């Protein structure tokens, strides 16, 4: 894959993430939307490429998709049909970061104040929850390009991954307090 294809994918991912987060860009909840855009690295002090992160997870998803395309399709353009699913992966990652920052009492993320240190833990939990829901809506958006059974499978895989993520976070937190750890 060429560097220009990767750059096109990253640009498409960023555009899609902004489109998905814009679901909350409404007058009554504009400050809530601002919290999400702050966490995503788009607004506020220190906003920019360092604050957004590398977007490696959605990029890997699109590169994988392009690598395993059908011979009847063009890998150079087919990946565009999967951008909303790739964005869902990044949104899930960010949901987990917001919650993890609270759970670990982390005050900084990517060189900036975390959401909970700026707006408090209750608001940060709500921001994380919103990112989780938006991610689930984002994966469903592939229904514009794929049959229902593919969409259901993609949604199921994302849900299972989230369940595994929360189990891992539970273990992480519970191990912090344990003194009798074994290899098993």
Q: Where are the language model's segments positioned?
A:
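A generic hydrophobic-helix recognition signal that picks specific residues
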Residues: 86, 93-94, 122, 161
């Amino acid at each position: 894959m060429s560097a220009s294809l990767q750059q096109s994918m990253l640009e498409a991912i960023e555009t899609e993430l902004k489109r998905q987060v814009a679901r909350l860009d409404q007058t009554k909840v504009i400050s809530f939307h601002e919290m999400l855009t702050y966490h995503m690295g788009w607004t506020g002090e220190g906003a920019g490429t360092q604050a957004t992160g590398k977007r490696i997870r959605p990029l890997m998803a699109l590169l994988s998709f392009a690598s395993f395309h059908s011979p009847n399709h063009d890998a150079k353009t087919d990946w565009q049909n999967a951008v909303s699913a790739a964005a869902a992966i990044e949104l899930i990652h960010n949901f987990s970061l917001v919650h993890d920052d609270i759970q670990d009492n982390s005050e900084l993320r990517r060189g900036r104040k975390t959401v909970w240190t700026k707006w408090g833990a209750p608001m940060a939990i709500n921001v994380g929850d919103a990112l989780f829901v938006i991610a689930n809506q984002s994966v469903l958006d592939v229904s514009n390009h794929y049959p229902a059974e593919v969409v259901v499978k993609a949604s199921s895989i994302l849900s299972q991954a989230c369940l595994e993520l929360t189990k891992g976070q539970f273990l992480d937190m519970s191990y912090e307090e344990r003194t009798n750890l074994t290899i098993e």
